[in-house]
Amino acid sequence: FKLKSDDKVVICAGLYFMRKGIDDFIKVAEQMPDVRFIWFGDTNKWVIPHKVRRLVEHDHPENVTFAGYIKGDVFEGAMSGSDAFFFPSREETEGIVVLEALASHQRVVLRDIPVYKGWLDDKSATFASDVPGFVKALRQVLADKTSTREAGYHVAESRSIDKVAHELVQVYEKVME
């Protein structure tokens, strides 16, 4: 990625769809030219709308990189080593990638959408609803003015497969009594 040690890096992971907020990701990057923005994920460019394809291929500033689909150590390193995880998705069913970021002790900046109600709050994540709000939130996170890492990690722990499975076993045993 040709990063320098003092680069501020914001990452995202998702498919190339407008509902994932790819357009706002780019608009935020345009307003923060001093920060590197890397989007992990891929979608066959022939099945996405022309506008999104243009954004990914060339209609984005130089501080944006579309890394494609990367897994394993490189992705895990990016998730835990970047300065923030920014997920401007307009609609989610669960937000699994958000849990991955939280489990990586990452500070997350999210669009304020209903799916996060009841399991995330301002102690575990930073929320905004538009481009100016995202820029402000990311500036605060990058300046270390937010401390959501530990609370976010505890949210991820509480929603781990092992924890949920244990709770289901307890419910099942109680029902069987």
Question: For the regions a protein language model found, what residue spans apply to each?
Answer:
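A charged, aromatic-enriched C-terminal amphipathic alpha-helix characteristic of glycosyltransferases
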Residues: 146-173
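Conserved acidic donor-binding segment of nucleotide-sugar-dependent glycosyltransferases
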Residues: 122-132, 140-145
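Aromatic "clamp/platform" in nucleotide-sugar-dependent glycosyltransferases that forms part
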Residues: 90
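Conserved donor-binding/catalytic core segment of Leloir-type glycosyltransferases
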Residues: 4-20, 26-30, 38
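Nucleotide-activated donor-binding/catalytic signature segment of Leloir-type glycosyltransferases, i.e.
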Residues: 50-70
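Short alpha-helical donor nucleotide-sugar binding micro-motif in glycosyltransferases
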Residues: 69-70, 77-82
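Short hydrophobic beta-strand element within catalytic cores of glycosyltransferases
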Residues: 103, 107-110
